[in-house]
């Protein structure tokens, strides 16, 4: 067979591929599908925006995030990380008081990456809307390869501290040599980039692991038909939720 195109992984795809493969290798997945009738939900969204009580437009995505945050407060075991050592047969589950959501975001170039939306459980609808808008603003000032390389190096150091020396060496060889070398900023270009205040660009804190994953597929594929029924859980998280596109279809309504 003749190869028609060959694309080497950039750092973003390397990180996603690494986390996804680790997910399927280490986590037994199960899925549950709930398909609500959302006509009244959408009516509430319209009523909130027509009320004049909010200085900004409240989106379906914002209210969905707020609703899920309240659900995690009611079921804190889902907002957790798990650790398990198979060799020593030791493990623990750590529940968190704050809800940090790893959420897929569409970038200006059309690519997607996962960002960490911090502490959404303690934000009201206006604060959450303004926070999401600010994240979008900071993306425009961010060199994503640079910030993701920072996250990758931080994760590599953590693995080194855990004694995973061979894995660390393999990762360094893969990212620093040959055709697969990760390209980062150099010289004056790097100096100019890091002169941008951290509150005006994304940092490692905005990319690192959250406590739970939510992927709003409906905002990415608005004309989607069918649904996603299994989303990979990113370790050490224990929960991943996929929100599908709103679809018109006949349903049975129980009065």
Residue ranges with predicted function:
Residues 1-255:
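C-terminal catalytic/motor cores of large multi-domain enzyme assemblies
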